[in-house]
Amino acid sequence: MKVKVFNLEGEPVEEIELPKVFSTPFRPDLIRRAVIASWTHRIQPQGRDPLAGKRRVTENIGKGHGMARVERIKTPPRFAAFVPFARGGRRTHPPKVEKIIWEDINKKERRLAIMSAIAATANPDLVRARGHVVDNVPAFPLVVVDDLQKVFKTAQTREIFKKLGIWDDIERAKRNTKIRAGKGKMRGRRYKKAKGPLIVVAKNEGIVQGARNHPGVDVVTVDNLGVELLAPGTHPGRLTIWTKGAIERLKEIYG
């Protein structure tokens, strides 16, 4: 399968053969598992001190005294201690660091999930279903010349994105940036930001600096490409711009 390569003016200049990875069957189940596994590996285990609430010298006076048979401190006023309902007592079911919080996925399954997510970027129906605005995008997958890697000015990338037909999707991402409900906005997560186009390059020669200020835009090299970037929120079909060098590197990695 051949695809057109566009220059920075949005004009086709040549055709190249797509690697076989773009013919991978669509596997949303594996993509979802791979994304969730990536999420869980960022969770930090938490626990409580095993001796919290137990550092008291207590005694149980037993029955027959007309008072509850709970552990009490030895010195007056002999408050209840140690038990969960006492002041300073232990917690009932505290979190434990031994809890298994990671979800694993086999290496071959993770590789297949990434390949399937890459193939999904070439399916216009999946890209539209994900919510991207692609009315002016000339081709799927959208492949551009390697000169894009050297653009380091935000104003220049804005004009390039307009000519490539992806600026409408960046404006959609800007409109959908909302203030988060709840206390998360007081904890460094004030804004919920929509995901816009993904730019995949063979080598960063300035494009990260030139594109990072556009709302929703992510830039990544092929070697660091992961399923979370290709399918944010477990939803495959992200609008993706590939450079010619990135396509050639894909052939080396995935065939």
From Swiss-Prot:
Lineage: superkingdom: Archaea
GO biological process, one term: translation
Keyword hit for rRNA-binding: yes
GO terms under cellular component: ribonucleoprotein complex; ribosome
Pfam families: Ribosomal_L4
Keywords in alphabetical order: Ribonucleoprotein, Ribosomal protein, RNA-binding, rRNA-binding
SUPFAM superfamilies the record matches: Ribosomal protein L4
Record bears the keyword rRNA-binding: yes
A molecular function GO annotation: structural constituent of ribosome
Region forming the signal peptide: none
UniProt-listed PANTHER family: 60S RIBOSOMAL PROTEIN L4
Assembly behavior: Part of the 50S ribosomal subunit.
NCBIfam families the UniProt entry points to: rpl4p_arch
Protein family per UniProt: Belongs to the universal ribosomal protein uL4 family.
Its biological purpose: One of the primary rRNA binding proteins, this protein initially binds near the 5'-end of the 23S rRNA. It is important during the early stages of 50S assembly. It makes multiple contacts with different domains of the 23S rRNA in the assembled 50S subunit and ribosome. Forms part of the polypeptide exit tunnel.
Protein name: Large ribosomal subunit protein uL4
Organism the protein comes from: Thermococcus gammatolerans (strain DSM 15229 / JCM 11827 / EJ3)
High-level lineage: Archaea, Methanobacteriati, Methanobacteriota, Thermococci, Thermococcales
